[in-house]
Amino acid sequence: MTKEYDNVLIVQTFSKSRSMAGMRIGYAMGNPELIKAMNDVRFSYNSYPMTRLSVALGVAAIEDEDYFQATKNQIIETREWTKRELKALGFTFGDSKTNFIFAKHSTVDAEVIFDKLREKHIFVRHFSGERIRNYLRI
């Protein structure tokens, strides 16, 4: 896709799929000119430069394909189970391959659900934008 479209950038974080949240490790793939432009300004938006330790850990994570596949499969299984449970509770959502579910309940306002969940120390995101007002990011 990056060869077909010069304005497409594919980014990957190691936070969830490689269990390295907080390490600030990831990469971007895209048109060489787009990557160069990002490199030219990277210190203005990236306040977490990669250390030698971060690079070594990132390389080790990439080389451990078995762990990555097991973690990825567990994330997918958990997401699909959660979608089934949410659907049974009256939620609707689009098909997504992300690590979150953007859901709307058929009869209960999202803000009400958000407040009730927060009271139980369950944290989801609620949005107030016009087109996504009644959705939760779970």
Question: Where are these predicted regions, by residue range?
Answer:
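Active-site catalytic microenvironments in core metabolic enzymes, especially phosphate/sugar-handling
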Residues: 125
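Conserved PLP-binding catalytic core of the aspartate aminotransferase-like
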Residues: 75-76, 80, 85-120, 136
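Short acidic/glycine-enriched loop/turn segments that link adjacent beta-strands
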Residues: 22, 97, 131-134
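Residue-level "edge-of-site" marker
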Residues: 51, 99, 130
